[in-house]
């Protein structure tokens, strides 16, 4: 009976853990040479008490080695795995909108009166590619991670603001439950399983059927897709070669359109059509 092959994602997780473990052991040895009283890292037991760790699961071992590297090899941790702070720009307000206005449902058109005759309305619209059907996600030979680009999603007019990006991935077939991941990597990171699993940003597990992953900025709107992603890149990892991935990309924009409001005074009301 042939030995069951180890899934690529499990293999990559062990390789990443072993890389961290080897680093912790190496640094521990170097520190002990400088200070004999230094308490180094131990995978199997608590070095301070000498007692075996109660939890030897992979998640517990990863948590322990991560904590140790953060405390005793901070520079290495920050260079390899730490999350960089995300800038938080001031909240943007669309032209003609009021800072006191409340958040409204998607697709609603809001009229904001600037004076007695002129106003601007903001219209929400979506663009997608491909338009008619989803397309297969293609990987290079002997690779199972690919970067997804969004430069084919264009606004109708220059100056339209971007609200969000939606990535649809339909997973068909496959022999294992763990289908793959969607993760955000730094701009200069290599597009590999190792970097994807070690990304400091949240990774989304994919399941059979249709998966929808939304990407939004910390501000209400941004000027471009690179601004929304903070110059980072989106990558998809396919864990099971027997499954097929099909994708479609969407972008939600806001467009300002000139409008004319009735002149005069009196009671003003709004009806929102949903």
Swiss-Prot record:
Q: What is this protein called?
A: Coat protein
Q: Does the keyword Cytoplasm apply?
A: no
One cellular-component annotation, GO: viral capsid
Q: Which InterPro entries match?
A: RBDV_coat
Q: Where is the composition biased (Basic and acidic residues)?
A: 102-112
Question: Cellular location of this protein?
Answer: Virion
Specify where the region named Disordered lies, as residue ranges. Answer: 88-112
Q: Which UniProt keywords apply?
A: Capsid protein, Virion
Q: Kindly report the protein's main subcellular placement as a broad class.
A: virion
Does the UniProt entry include the keyword Nucleotidyltransferase? Answer: no
- List the Pfam families: RBDV_coat (PF06593)
Which top-rank group of organisms is this from? Answer: Viruses
């Amino acid at each position: 009976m042939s030995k069951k092959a180890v899934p690529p994602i499990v293999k990559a997780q062990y390789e990443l853990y072993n890389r961290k473990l080897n680093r912790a052991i190496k640094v521990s040895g170097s520190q002990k040479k400088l200070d004999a009283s230094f308490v180094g890292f131990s995978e199997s037991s608590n070095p301070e008490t000498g007692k075996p760790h109660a939890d030897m699961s992979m998640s517990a071992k990863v948590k322990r080695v991560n904590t140790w590297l953060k405390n005793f090899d901070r520079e290495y941790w920050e260079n390899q795995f730490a999350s960089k702070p995300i800038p938080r720009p001031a909240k943007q307000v669309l032209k003609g909108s009021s800072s006191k206005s409340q958040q409204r449902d998607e697709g609603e058109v809001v009229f904001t009166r600037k004076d007695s005759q002129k106003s601007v309305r903001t219209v929400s619209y979506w663009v997608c590619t491909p338009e008619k059907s989803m397309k297969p996600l293609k990987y290079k030979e002997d690779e199972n991670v690919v970067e997804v680009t969004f430069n084919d999603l264009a606004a109708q007019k220059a100056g339209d603001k971007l609200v969000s990006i939606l990535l649809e991935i339909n997973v068909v077939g496959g022999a294992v439950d763990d289908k793959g991941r969607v993760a955000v990597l730094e701009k200069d990171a290599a597009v590999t399983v190792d970097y994807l699993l070690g990304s400091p940003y949240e990774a989304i597990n994919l399941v059979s059927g249709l998966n929808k992953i939304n990407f939004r900025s910390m501000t209400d709107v941004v000027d471009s897709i690179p601004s929304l992603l903070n110059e980072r890149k989106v990558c998809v990892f396919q864990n099971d070669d027997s499954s097929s991935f099909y994708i479609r990309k969407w972008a939600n924009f806001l467009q300002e359109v000139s409008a004319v409001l009735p002149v005069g005074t009196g009671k003003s009301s709004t009806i929102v059509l949903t």
